[in-house]
From Swiss-Prot:
Stated family: Belongs to the universal ribosomal protein uL14 family.
This protein's GO CC annotations: cytosolic large ribosomal subunit
Function: Binds to 23S rRNA. Forms part of two intersubunit bridges in the 70S ribosome.
UniProt-recorded name of the protein: Large ribosomal subunit protein uL14
Record note on quaternary structure: Part of the 50S ribosomal subunit. Forms a cluster with proteins L3 and L19. In the 70S ribosome, L14 and L19 interact and together make contacts with the 16S rRNA in bridges B5 and B8.
Length: 122
């Protein structure tokens, strides 16, 4: 469960290392984001010479959450960290690589380019 002020690791090679959630998209009073949801965030930590700089406002899709999520078959999925991938306005990833596994929920939400770059889909 990601909400305002949540900090997430960045799981791509855009140059950002950590982002802070400013807003959860998808409704005026939407409070939480899960795997596959889009958030607006600001870059809190970045490496020098990266595509994004500290202070940039970006859109990102959540790919891993610590809070467990129930799937339609009754199983649960949870990860060791909260992580997101920075995306362009057309919902394609901004980086060219993705690090670590991503949730299967991304396929249901039609993030196919992101799925193809991911090393593992759980």
């Amino acid at each position: 469960m990601i909400q305002q002020e949540s900090r997430l690791k960045v799981a791509d090679n855009t140059g950002a290392k950590e982002i802070l959630c400013i807003r959860v998209l998808g409704g005026s009073s939407r409070r939480y984001a899960g795997i596959g949801d889009i958030i607006v965030a600001t870059v809190k930590d970045a490496i020098p010479g990266g595509n994004v700089k500290r202070g940039d406002v970006v859109k990102a899709v959540v790919v891993r959450t610590v809070k467990e999520r129930r799937r339609p078959d009754g199983s649960y999925i949870k990860f060791d960290e909260n992580a997101a991938v920075i995306i362009k306005p057309d919902n394609d990833p901004r980086g060219t690589r993705i690090f670590g596994p991503v949730g299967r929920e991304l396929r249901e939400k039609r993030f196919m380019k992101l799925i193809s770059l991911a090393p593992e889909v759980l």
